[in-house]
Amino acid sequence: MSAKIIAFSAVVATASAFAPTAGFVPRLRSGATSVNMAMDKSAKAPVITIFDHRGCSRAPKEYTGAKAGGKDDEMMVKAQSVKIEVSTGTAEGVLATSLAKMTK
């Protein structure tokens, strides 16, 4: 019986954690608060490269840090932020394709 009470209490606690507060009223944001919410126009995106040299005879030159002493020495994940360059023609083609699929 106590297990049922504990399970019920957990469900109630979870539901109340995700319920909005009674005094919450959505409002329009003023100009001062929306300034920091502007879209990032830097055109940068994360680029993730995975290097897996397990079983490869080529000496890895990408990583120059200390070795772990195991199979992880032959693997590496590189994450970087790169500015994405897209031509206007490519952008127009993607837009046209997207709009054509949205009307169907």
Swiss-Prot record:
Residues 61-63 are annotated as: 15,16-dihydrobiliverdin chromophore. It is a peripheral membrane protein. Residues 1-37 form a transit peptide. Its main location: plastid. One of its GO terms (biological process) is photosynthesis. Keywords: Bile pigment, Chloroplast, Chromophore, Electron transport, Hydroxylation, Membrane, Photosynthesis, Plastid, Thylakoid, Transit peptide, Transport. 15,16-dihydrobiliverdin binds at C56, R58, K78. It comes from the Eukaryota. The modification 5-hydroxylysine is found at K41. InterPro entries: Globular_prot_asu/bsu, Phycoerythr-like_a_sf, Phycoerythr_a. One of its GO terms (cellular component) is chloroplast thylakoid membrane. It is found in: Plastid, Chloroplast thylakoid membrane. Contains one covalently linked 15,16-dihydrobiliverdin chromophore. Belongs to the phycoerythrin family. Heterotetramer of 2 different alpha chains and 2 identical beta chains. The subunit composition could comprise of any combination of 2 out of 4 different alpha units with an invariant beta unit. Light-harvesting photosynthetic tetrapyrrole chromophore-protein from the phycobiliprotein complex. The light-harvesting system in Cryptophytes contains phycobiliprotein complexes. Unusually they are composed of either phycoerythrin (CPE) or phycocyanin (CPC) but never allophycocyanin (APC), with only one type of biliprotein being present in any one species. Unlike cyanobacteria or red algae these proteins are not arranged into higher-order phycobilisome complexes, and they are found in the thylakoid lumen. This is Phycoerythrin alpha-2 chain, chloroplastic. The gene is cpeA2.
